[in-house]
C-alpha cells in the first residue's frame, strides 16, 4: 500500500511538471509569432508585368532593378509597346500596370482606369548636333510642324528643307507635344516612328531633321534645343519654367486589387524612397 501511494504521488508530480513545461512552451511560441508578425513582414515573390510607354524605359528600368535587388524572388517585366498599347493592356488584364507618358483621357477614366502620376518628364525638341539653331519659341515649333515654316533659314538655320520627325498616333509623347504646341491633327510629319529610340536615331542621322523625345532618354548623338530661352533640364522641369513637359503615369484598374508583388512594386515606385532613383534616370519624382 505504501509502495502504491508512493508511485501515485510520483505520477502526479510528473504530470504536474509536464503541464508546467507545456504551458511554458506554448507561451514561448506565442511570443515568437507575435514578434514575427510585428517586425518581419512576409517577403513578396512572383512577377510584375508592366507594359506601355517607351519614354518611361529608363525610369521603369531603374526602379525595377532596385526593387528586384531588394526582393530576390521577384521579377519585373517591361514591354515597350507605347502608351496607347499599355493602357489597352491593363484594361484587358494582360499586364499588372500600364505605363503612359500622358495623362489618362476622360473616356479612359470613365472606362474604369485610374492614373497615378509617378514623375514628370520634359519633352526635348531635338536636332542634329551640326544644326546651328539653338533656341526656338513654342510658336516657331508649331509653325515648323504644321508646315508654315519649311526652311531652316527662316528660324536662323541653314538654307535647307526641314524634315519633320514624330511619333505614331498612339504615342503619349506625341499627345503631349501636340497638346502643348497646339498642333493636334495639324502636323506634317515626314516620318512617324514607334519608339523614342527610333526618333533619336533618325534625327542623329539627318542634319536637317527635327524631332521630339523624352528628356530622360536624350543622348549625345542629338542636340536638345532651348524653348523660349529655357534649357530643358530636371531643374527647369521641376520649377515649371520649361513648358514642354508631361506626366509619367502608372495606369491601373479602379477597384481591382493588384497581386501582392505588383502592389509592393507600385508602393515602392511611388514612395519617397524612389525619388532619387527616378531623378538619376532623368525625370522628376511626383513625390
PLM regions with names:
Residues 1-4, 8-9:
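Positively charged n-region of N-terminal signal peptides that target proteins for export
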Residues 4, 21-30, 34-287:
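Exported/periplasmic ABC-transporter solute-binding proteins
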Amino acid at each position: 500500500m505504501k509502495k502504491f501511494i508512493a508511485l501515485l504521488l510520483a505520477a502526479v508530480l510528473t504530470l504536474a511538471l509536464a503541464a508546467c513545461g507545456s504551458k511554458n512552451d506554448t507561451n514561448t511560441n506565442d511570443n515568437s509569432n507575435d514578434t514575427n508578425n510585428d517586425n518581419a513582414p512576409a517577403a513578396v515573390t512572383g512577377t510584375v508585368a508592366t507594359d506601355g510607354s517607351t519614354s518611361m524605359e529608363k525610369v521603369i528600368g531603374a526602379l525595377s532593378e532596385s526593387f528586384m535587388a531588394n526582393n530576390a524572388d521577384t521579377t519585373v517585366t517591361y514591354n515597350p509597346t507605347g502608351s496607347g498599347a499599355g493602357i489597352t493592356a491593363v484594361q484587358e488584364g494582360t499586364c499588372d500596370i500600364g505605363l503612359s507618358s500622358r495623362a489618362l483621357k476622360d473616356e479612359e477614366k470613365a472606362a474604369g482606369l485610374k492614373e497615378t502620376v509617378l514623375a514628370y518628364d520634359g519633352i526635348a525638341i531635338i536636332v542634329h548636333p551640326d544644326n546651328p539653331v539653338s533656341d526656338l519659341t513654342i510658336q516657331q515649333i508649331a509653325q515648323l510642324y504644321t508646315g508654315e515654316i519649311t526652311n531652316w533659314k527662316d528660324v536662323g538655320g541653314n538654307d535647307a528643307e526641314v524634315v519633320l520627325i514624330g511619333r505614331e498616333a498612339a504615342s503619349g509623347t506625341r499627345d503631349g507635344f501636340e497638346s502643348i504646341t497646339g498642333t493636334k491633327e495639324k502636323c506634317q510629319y515626314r516620318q512617324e516612328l514607334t519608339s523614342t529610340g527610333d526618333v533619336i536615331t533618325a534625327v542623329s542621322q539627318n542634319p536637317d531633321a527635327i524631332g521630339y523625345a523624352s528628356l530622360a532618354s536624350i543622348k549625345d548623338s542629338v542636340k536638345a534645343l532651348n524653348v523660349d530661352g529655357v534649357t530643358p533640364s530636371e531643374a527647369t522641369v521641376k520649377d515649371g519654367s520649361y513648358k514642354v513637359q508631361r506626366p509619367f503615369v502608372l495606369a491601373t484598374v479602379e477597384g481591382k486589387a493588384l497581386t501582392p508583388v505588383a502592389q509592393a512594386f507600385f508602393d515602392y515606385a511611388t514612395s519617397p524612397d524612389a525619388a532619387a532613383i527616378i531623378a538619376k534616370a532623368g525625370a522628376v519624382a511626383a513625390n
